[in-house]
């Protein structure tokens, strides 16, 4: 695969993911009920604000749909990439570059947090961030979970259990979100958790089953010799995802420090 084709495919995948990420289900679900979620509670279009103002069923629907935005973006990129297999020609180049499908899922998170109207307003108002904030999206937690699920079901399972454990114990959705996404890049450094199931095993260069039949060779579980390129790229993407999602929670962090953050699923609608 020549560099020109690779750059073209990367741009295409980023565009696809960002476009899908721009579909803000929080707004669509709220408008189907005759209201605009941006005028309720915190004004955020994410599942938490929807739950607090429109109920748990609406919140759950938004959470699931936001989850599948990033997962579906990665899957669409996978289908396109496989369709390009024969035009690429070089099988080794095709296998080694397969990791770029995850750019679609990552771009969907960006599109979810900062849709095109946000940037349009930002440039139109000469970088008036307060005005552009009115058109910002969600905080990216559900989409980040979908992105993790597109990489590895094991990674998603760990994040799922960790998130709900912290949420149920602390009663803070924001704290659970921040801690879970902060640890997300770490899981990607463990090869057998970072299981690229969407790609063929031959392409992912990884054995999904750790060598439990050789208990004295624990180091074999952390064998980076074959799939280090996939692990490096997904680690960087998940690191950027963590930075983005934590940044989107900056106001929540301040309220947590001050002891002013709302408990999960409180009935009163203040700020999120």
Swiss-Prot record:
Superkingdom classification of source: Bacteria
Keyword set, alphabetical order: Cell membrane, Lipid biosynthesis, Lipid metabolism, Membrane, Phospholipid biosynthesis, Phospholipid metabolism, Transferase, Transmembrane, Transmembrane helix
Reactions this protein catalyses: an acyl phosphate + sn-glycerol 3-phosphate = a 1-acyl-sn-glycero-3-phosphate + phosphate
Residue spans crossing the bilayer: 9-29, 60-80, 99-119, 149-169, 173-193, 226-246
Subcellular location: Cell membrane
EC number: 2.3.1.275
GO cellular component, one term: plasma membrane
Stored InterPro entries: G3P_acylTferase_PlsY
Pathway(s) it belongs to: Lipid metabolism; phospholipid metabolism
Enzyme class label: transferase
Topology of the protein relative to the lipid bilayer: Multi-pass membrane protein
Example of a GO MF term: acyl-phosphate glycerol-3-phosphate acyltransferase activity
Record GO biological process: phospholipid biosynthetic process
Entries under NCBIfam families matching the protein: glycerol-3-phosphate 1-O-acyltransferase PlsY
The protein's assembly and partners: Probably interacts with PlsX.
Function summary: Catalyzes the transfer of an acyl group from acyl-phosphate (acyl-PO(4)) to glycerol-3-phosphate (G3P) to form lysophosphatidic acid (LPA). This enzyme utilizes acyl-phosphate as fatty acyl donor, but not acyl-CoA or acyl-ACP.
Similarity comment: Belongs to the PlsY family.
Name of protein: Glycerol-3-phosphate acyltransferase
Highest classification ranks of the organism: Bacteria, Bacillati, Mycoplasmatota, Mycoplasmoidales, Mycoplasmoidaceae
């Amino acid at each position: 695969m020549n560099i020109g084709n690779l750059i073209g495919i990367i741009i295409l995948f980023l565009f696809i993911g960002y476009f899908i990420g721009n579909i803000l289900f929080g707004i669509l679900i709220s408008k189907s009920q005759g209201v605009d979620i941006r005028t309720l509670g915190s004004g955020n279009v994410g599942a938490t604000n929807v739950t607090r103002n429109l109920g748990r069923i609406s919140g759950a629907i938004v959470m699931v749909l936001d989850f599948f935005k990033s997962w579906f973006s990665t899957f669409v990129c996978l289908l396109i990439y496989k369709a390009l297999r024969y035009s690429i020609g070089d099988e080794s180049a095709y296998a080694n570059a397969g990791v770029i499908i995850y750019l679609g899922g990552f771009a969907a998170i960006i599109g979810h947090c900062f849709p095109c109207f946000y940037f349009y307003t930002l440039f139109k108002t000469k970088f008036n961030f307060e005005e552009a904030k009115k058109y910002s999206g969600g905080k990216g937690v559900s989409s980040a979970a979908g992105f993790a699920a597109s990489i590895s079901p094991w990674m998603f399972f760990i994040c799922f259990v960790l998130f709900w454990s912290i949420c149920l114990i602390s009663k803070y959705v924001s704290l659970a979100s921040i801690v879970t996404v902060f640890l997300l890049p770490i899981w990607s450094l463990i090869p057998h958790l970072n299981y690229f199931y969407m790609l063929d095993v031959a392409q992912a260069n990884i054995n999904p089953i750790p060598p439990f039949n050789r208990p004295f060779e624990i180091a074999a579980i952390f064998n980076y010799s074959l799939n280090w390129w996939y692990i490096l790229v997904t680690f960087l993407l998940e690191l950027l995802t963590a930075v983005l999602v934590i940044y989107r929670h900056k106001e929540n962090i301040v309220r947590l420090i001050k002891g002013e953050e709302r408990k999960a699923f409180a009935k009163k609608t203040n700020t999120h």
